[in-house]
Amino acid sequence: MFDILMYLFENYVHSEVELLVDEDELTKELTRAGFHQSEILKALTWLERLAELQEGDKPYLCNHDQHSFRIYTKEEMEKLDVECRGFLLFLEQVKVLNVETREMVIDRVMELDEPALILEDLKWVILMVLFNAPGHESAYEQMEDLIFEQPEEGRLHS
């Protein structure tokens, strides 16, 4: 399923090509690209649920304390290793993510059928969430820079 999400993001969203609106046409396109029907349906459901998160009726998106500390569940820790959780904390500290977008990311990560996520895949999920979160254009651009601008070899600081 994650491969399909990446395919859609790279070929439609990130390339600024208009995403096909008709789900049947999109399914046919993905089938022609070599993806299986069951995985296509999972990916489309994942995207629909991402869009639903923007409605803000999830309890974790309301009435939060900006200074609270996130405690991960056992299942979340199995899917997000220490490196991934540390990266989420880093993104909050540098204001790329806030409490709401962090929770959206965790929600979407937990919906993936991967047993565990590597940091590179987490970065793409974060990018997808920020792209779909109105009012977070600056955070999206910062995240995009973190993904695409690799530091020069042997150079840690500017």
UniProtKB/Swiss-Prot annotation:
HAMAP family: Smg. The lineage of its organism: Bacteria, Pseudomonadati, Pseudomonadota, Gammaproteobacteria, Alteromonadales. The gene is smg. InterPro entries: Smg (IPR007456). This is Protein Smg homolog. Disulfide bonds: none annotated. Belongs to the Smg family. Signal peptide: none annotated. It comes from Shewanella sp. (strain MR-4).
